[in-house]
Amino acid sequence: MYTYLMKFEWNSGKNEKLKKERNISFEQIIFHLSEGDLWKIADHPNQNDYPGQKIYFVIVDGYIYLVPFIVDDDYIFLKTIIPSRKATKDYTQENGD
């Protein structure tokens, strides 16, 4: 299992691409996680292709971003950041916002 003391890692090239294309970064995601802006964590729905991978559902300015990740012994590796209109709708309905 992982703890809040574990460090986060990611691909720096992917981070730069996300900043340019989606106006979001792994640093922003980590900030929001540290602030408790986490709706839920789920197993990746396609465990055949992504075994052991999980997904953070992170709340950023009222919008849900899906952040697939892998837990290693020493760190959590963040794979990408995906804005999700469907998850945002589900979150809003569930929380009455």
Task: Describe every region a protein language model picked out.
Residues 1-97:
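Ribonuclease/tRNase effector modules and their secretory precursors
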